[in-house]
Amino acid sequence: KALEKTTMVAGEEVVPEKEAKDEKTVANGYFKDADVKDRELSDYTGEWQSVYPLLKDGILDEVFDYKAKLNKDMTAAEYKDYYTTGYKTDIDTINIKDNTIDFVVNGEHHQYTYKYVGYKILNYEKGNRGVRFNFETDDAGAGRFKYIQFSDHGIAPSKAEHFHIFFGGESQEKLYNEMHNWPTFYPASLSEHEIAQEMMAH
């Protein structure tokens, strides 16, 4: 019920919010190269939950309905398909502390120590850009978690409110090509409805 209320209230503000999404802001991917700064793993410190289970359980259907009405570029079903591909992951939670990242998959912990290795600015087809902040571990047993990239719509040091993560065992360069699957994590302290509300405001 609370979620339905939020959707209705937000719906009254469709026009100004649509304008806001078109603004050339940093969050929307418009910035100067000189404004991009290196970031520490501490920007991502905390306990994070995957939003993929929420999508599978139908919790985010209200979000897709809202996006379809707001943007009028895809149907709610098309949005759900797009985000199903984007959010898909077998990682349940990610815990980040100091220089370590602990990936929890089906109750099993995969924890490694990481170092920052720089950032990459990516140009997107629609004219905006994004920044991936790259980390890697020297642990020989890290497998698919050797190379890590964070994207949280920020370009300089600041605490992430949520993030998309890219990972693999081959190279950072290979991960730059991944544009369709971006597992997404929100603070573990947020409820399902709080996450849905954050998404509608995003």
Question: Which stretches of residues belong to each language-model region?
Answer:
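Generic short beta-strand segments
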Residues: 49-56, 100, 106
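Beta-strand cores of secreted/periplasmic/IMS beta-sandwich domains, seen most often
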Residues: 42, 47-53, 93-96
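N-terminal helix-cap/turn-to-beta initiation motif at the start of protein domains
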Residues: 31-47
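N-terminal glycine/threonine-rich, aromatic-flanked beta-hairpin/loop signature
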Residues: 61-115
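Helix N-cap and loop-to-helix transition residues
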Residues: 40, 75, 191-192
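Calycin-type beta-barrel ligand-binding domains and close structural analogs
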Residues: 3-35, 96-202
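Sec/Tat-exported extracytoplasmic proteins
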Residues: 45, 52-59, 86-87
